[in-house]
Amino acid sequence: MFSKKPHGDVKKSTQKVLDTKKDALTRLKHLRIVIENAESIDLKQFFDQHFSHIYYVFFENFVTIEASLKQKGHKSQREELDAILFIFEKILQLLPERIHQRWQFHSIGLILKKLLHTGNSLKIRREGVRLFLLWLQALQNNCSREQLWMFSCLIPGFSAPQSEYGPRTLDNLINPPLNLQETQVTIEEITPLVPPQSGDKGQEDLTSYFLEALLKYIVIQVKSLEWKNKENQERGFSFLFSHFKKYYLPYIFPNICKENSLYHPVLDIPQMRPKPHYVMIKKDAETNEAIYCTKEPFIKARVIVIRWLVSFWLEPKPHTGPHIPGMEGEVLPKNIQ
């Protein structure tokens, strides 16, 4: 076990991770050494055997860093947050079977709410989206309604899902409204970990920004979860994509024909669509050219989804594809290649 040893004796670091007499920060440093120098198979086995120690080390250090961020909030504390989130990601990736059984369900959910808080910087919120999708990919059907509501609120600009409690937004899911008639005991309010800094680059279109992130992460993270049964990777993707279709596609493509199918296409000529109405929204500061936009909502989101789908259909194969005269330099669809 632990055949790679470019950084000292990894076995000694393993022992120090498990040594409860050592402080949490020391154990964290040695846990990082183990993660960075162990073979992937050995690392999976190590996490499976010592999951309780590993989560304790992570959580104790996360709490310390959170308190430090709220007191100081300097660049060094933000770098420490990035480092502890690396450990958090490894926990999500290497322990999907336990997470699927709701291991540390409330603790992990609380941490993700702190990352997804709308008062955080865009970088932290986007990282929260990425880690939340990893968690949901592991939970699959063992998640609760709250996680599905949160998934439906990850991309701002869409209608809030309805429930018996009224509209559900990311804000009231992270910090539910108080009802003092039910109980006098209230949970502590969740506050931002890293508010936007003065030099942070903003985004004019948050809907497009988070939509692109969500579509990217539900694909590229599929194989990052180390399931013992590899079929769960595809199940995890199917779970996320089915809920994307449920919560977002009806708004992005409100007039989509549900009767259409790749296997049983409708070949009738469709009715003419009305011509879109464009309005000038602003002028370019450098060129003074007018910038127009259609009044139709989610038009940019529609373009993003279409481009995302096309990226899987048009895949460049520079050396393996056949030569077709007149198509030099063109990217050919897979069915032509």
Curated annotation (Swiss-Prot):
Keyword terms of this UniProt record: Cytoplasm, GTPase activation, Nucleus
Keyword set includes Cytoplasm: yes
GO MF, one example: GTPase activator activity
GO biological process terms held by the UniProt record: activation of GTPase activity
GO cellular component, one term: cytoplasm
Top-level taxon in the UniProt lineage: Eukaryota
Cross-referenced InterPro entries: Tuberin/Ral-act_asu (IPR027107)
Subcellular location as annotated: Cytoplasm; Nucleus
Known partners and oligomeric status: Component of the heterodimeric RalGAP1 complex with RALGAPB. Heterodimerization is required for activity. Interacts with the HLH region of TCF3/isoform E12.
Its biological purpose: Catalytic subunit of the heterodimeric RalGAP1 complex which acts as a GTPase activator for the Ras-like small GTPases RALA and RALB.
PANTHER family: RAL GTPASE-ACTIVATING PROTEIN SUBUNIT ALPHA-1, TUBERIN
Protein's name according to its UniProt entry: Ral GTPase-activating protein subunit alpha-1
Organism: Sus scrofa
The organism's taxonomic lineage, starting at the top: Eukaryota, Metazoa, Chordata, Craniata, Vertebrata
